[in-house]
Design a protein with these regions (language model features):
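A short acidic, Gly/Pro-enriched loop at the edge of an enzyme's catalytic core
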Residues: 98, 112-122
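Core SAM-dependent methyltransferase catalytic element
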Residues: 205-246
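Conserved beta-strand signature within the Rossmann-like core of class I S-adenosyl-L-methionine
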Residues: 65-68, 151-159
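Class I SAM-dependent methyltransferase Rossmann-like catalytic core
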Residues: 3-37
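S-adenosyl-L-methionine
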Residues: 79-111
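Conserved class I S-adenosyl-L-methionine
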Residues: 37-47
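A short, conserved alpha-helix within the catalytic core of class I
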Residues: 105-109, 130-143
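A short glycine-rich, Lys/Arg-flanked "PGG" loop and its adjoining helix->strand segment in the class I
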Residues: 56-57, 137-150
C-alpha cells in the first residue's frame, strides 16, 4: 500500500470525507500534478479541509504545506467567517495530523499575497467560480504566480462548463469553461502544460436548476426523491489542468 493510500484510509478522515474519494480521485489528481512527500505546497481556500486531510500528513515530515484562507476580520460574509473558524478548529484539534500546517489569512475582496518562501506547487480545488463571481480572479492568479518558484506548478480542479458558455452563465451555474481558466492563467504569466480527464463525469449534463450546487455534496433545493436521483449522477464533471511558471 502506498503512503498516500494509507493516508486516505486513515482514521483522521471521516466516513463522509472518504465517501467523496470515488468522485475526487485524490491519488490520481495529486500524482498528475506531481506532488510528492518532499514538495512545498500552497493550498488555496481549502473550505472545510477535504484536501488538507490528505496533504498535511503527506507533507508533514519532508515537505511543507501553507493553506490560504480568508481573514474573518476582513470579510462581511457570514459564511466565510464561519468557514474560517471551522477550518482553524479542525487543525487545532488534531495537532498530530495538522501541527505543521501554516495558515496564511488574506482579505476576501483584495487577495493580494505572496508566501514568505517560493513553493513548488499552488493547488486549488473547485474555487475558480467563486473568484470569477467576486471579481478577484486576476488578483488570485497573480498571487499564485508570485508565490511559485520558477518551474513551479499551478494545479487547478474546477467544475467544467461546456465550451462556449457565456461568462454570465458560468458564474450563475458554478461551471467554468476550460478556455476561461486557461486565459486567466495565461494573463497571469502561466504556461499551460496538460490536462487530465481524471475528474470527468459524463453523467453530469450541467443543466441543473440550481447549478452545480444541485449535485453532491450540496444537493441544494431538492426534495428527498430528487436527491436520490441526483446521487446517481455523483459530483460534477471537472477539468483538471496543470500550468507552469516560466
Amino acid at each position: 500500500m502506498t503512503q498516500m493510500q494509507t493516508i486516505i484510509d486513515g482514521s483522521h478522515r471521516t466516513a463522509k470525507s472518504k465517501a467523496r474519494d470515488v468522485y475526487r480521485h485524490p491519488i490520481e489528481t495529486l500524482s498528475f500534478f506531481g506532488v510528492s512527500k518532499n514538495s512545498s505546497v500552497v493550498e488555496i481556500t481549502p473550505g472545510r479541509g477535504w484536501y488538507t486531510e490528505i496533504l498535511a500528513p503527506l507533507l508533514k515530515d519532508k515537505g511543507s504545506l501553507v493553506t490560504v484562507i480568508y481573514d474573518a476580520n476582513l470579510t462581511k460574509v457570514p459564511y466565510l467567517q464561519k468557514l474560517n473558524k471551522l477550518y482553524k478548529n479542525k487543525l487545532a484539534n488534531d495537532k498530530k495530523t495538522y501541527g505543521r500546517v501554516k495558515i496564511l489569512e488574506i482579505a476576501h475582496m483584495k487577495p493580494d499575497f505572496k508566501t514568505k518562501k517560493s513553493v513548488d506547487f499552488v493547488l486549488t480545488f473547485r474555487n475558480v467560480h467563486n473568484w470569477a463571481k467576486s471579481g478577484t480572479i486576476d488578483k488570485m492568479f497573480d498571487s499564485f504566480y508570485k508565490s511559485l518558484s520558477t518551474g513551479g506548478v499551478l494545479g487547478v480542479v474546477e467544475h467544467r462548463a461546456n465550451a462556449g458558455t457565456s461568462l454570465e452563465q458560468q458564474i450563475k451555474s458554478g461551471y467554468m469553461t476550460e478556455n476561461y481558466v486557461k486565459q486567466i492563467a495565461k494573463s497571469a504569466g502561466f504556461r499551460f502544460v496538460s490536462s487530465s480527464e481524471i475528474n470527468a463525469n459524463p453523467l453530469d449534463r450541467k443543466n441543473h436548476r440550481n447549478g452545480v450546487w444541485t449535485l453532491l455534496p450540496n444537493q441544494r433545493g431538492l426534495s428527498e426523491p430528487e436527491k436520490e436521483l441526483y446521487r446517481k449522477i455523483g459530483e460534477s464533471d471537472r477539468m483538471t489542468l496543470k500550468f507552469i511558471k516560466n
